[in-house]
Design a protein with these regions (language model features):
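Residues lining the SAM
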Residues: 122-127, 154
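A short glycine-rich, Lys/Arg-flanked "PGG" loop and its adjoining helix->strand segment in the class I
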Residues: 135-147
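C-terminal alpha-helical "lid/dimerization" subdomain adjacent to the S-adenosyl-L-methionine
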Residues: 154-213
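A short His-aromatic
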Residues: 71, 127-129
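Conserved class I S-adenosyl-L-methionine
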Residues: 2-48, 63, 67
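Core SAM-dependent methyltransferase catalytic element
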Residues: 215-240
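A short acidic, Gly/Pro-enriched loop at the edge of an enzyme's catalytic core
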Residues: 112-120
Length: 240
C-alpha cells in the first residue's frame, strides 16, 4: 500500500475535524463558493435529459453532487473524498438519490478511476492533491473519460504575485461587505482556534492548463475567473 503524502494526511485530518460545521461556516464565508459550482455545471456541454456518468473529485458534503443530480435528473455519479466524516454528511444529504450515487473514501492522487465517464468535475478540491501528483492526475483523468468526455475543474489558484494576492483578499472583503455578509461568531471562533494546516497547496492557473494539454486534452481554456477562483475546461478528443 503506498505511503500517504503528508498533504493528504493533513487534508483528511482537517476535513474530518470540520465536517460538522462545513456547510454552516464555509458555504457562506468561502469566496465564490456557489458561483464556482454554477460555472462548473454550466460548462457541461450536454442536454439536461442526458444519462451522464460523472466522476467527482472531492465530493465533500455533497453540495456540488446534489446540484449535478438535480440539473441532470438521469445522471449517475461516482464521487471520491479523502475524509470519511465529510462523506458521512454527503451520504445523509444524498440518501434520496439511491443508486444514482456511489461515494468512496480515498486519496484521489492514488485511485484508479472506474471509467469510462462522460465528465469529470470538481470544485475547490484538486489543490489538496500533493504537488508532485498533480500532473499525473490529469493523465489519469484523461484515461478515465470516454472520447468526447469533458474535464471541468473549479479551484483555488495561486495569485501571480503576493501583492496581487493581497489585493484579491481586499476586494473579496469589500464584496462581502457590499453583500451584507459578515463574519459570524462561529466562523471567527473556527479561524482563531484552527491552527492545523488543511494540506492545500494551490498552483498557478497556467500550470493546470499546461498539464491538461500535456495529458492530451483539447480545447483547453480558463472559462471563468474571479480573483483567485477559476474554472478550467478540457475535452478528450473524439477518436477517428
Amino acid at each position: 500500500m503506498p505511503t500517504e503524502h503528508p498533504n493528504v494526511v493533513l487534508s483528511r485530518q482537517h476535513f474530518d475535524l470540520m465536517a460538522d460545521q462545513y456547510d454552516e461556516l464555509f458555504v457562506t464565508h468561502m469566496h465564490a463558493y456557489d458561483l464556482t459550482h454554477e460555472m462548473v455545471l454550466t460548462m457541461l456541454p450536454f442536454p439536461r435529459e442526458s444519462a451522464l456518468r460523472v466522476l467527482e473529485l472531492g465530493t465533500g458534503t455533497g453540495n456540488l453532487t446534489q446540484k449535478l443530480l438535480d440539473r441532470f435528473p438521469k445522471s449517475t455519479l461516482v464521487g471520491y473524498d479523502v475524509s470519511a466524516e465529510m462523506l458521512a454528511r454527503a451520504r445523509a444529504k444524498l440518501a434520496r438519490a439511491g443508486t444514482r450515487v456511489q461515494l468512496h473514501q480515498g486519496d484521489i492522487s492514488q485511485i484508479a478511476f472506474p471509467g469510462p465517464f462522460d465528465a469529470a468535475i470538481s470544485a475547490i478540491a484538486v489543490h489538496h492533491v500533493p504537488p508532485p501528483a498533480k500532473p499525473i492526475l490529469f493523465h489519469r483523468l484523461y484515461a478515465a473519460l470516454r472520447p468526447g468526455g469533458v474535464l471541468i475543474l473549479g479551484d483555488a489558484f495561486q495569485p501571480a504575485t503576493p501583492a496581487l494576492g493581497e489585493r484579491y483578499r481586499q476586494l473579496t472583503a469589500e464584496e462581502f461587505e457590499r453583500q451584507g455578509i459578515i463574519e459570524t461568531p462561529a466562523y471567527a471562533e473556527y479561524r482563531s482556534r484552527n491552527s492545523q494546516p488543511s494540506g492545500g497547496a494551490s498552483t498557478h492557473l497556467q500550470k493546470y492548463l499546461q498539464w491538461m494539454q500535456q495529458a492530451g486534452f483539447s480545447n483547453v481554456d480558463c472559462v471563468w475567473k474571479q480573483f483567485a477562483r477559476a474554472v478550467v475546461y478540457g475535452e478528450r478528443p473524439l477518436e477517428a
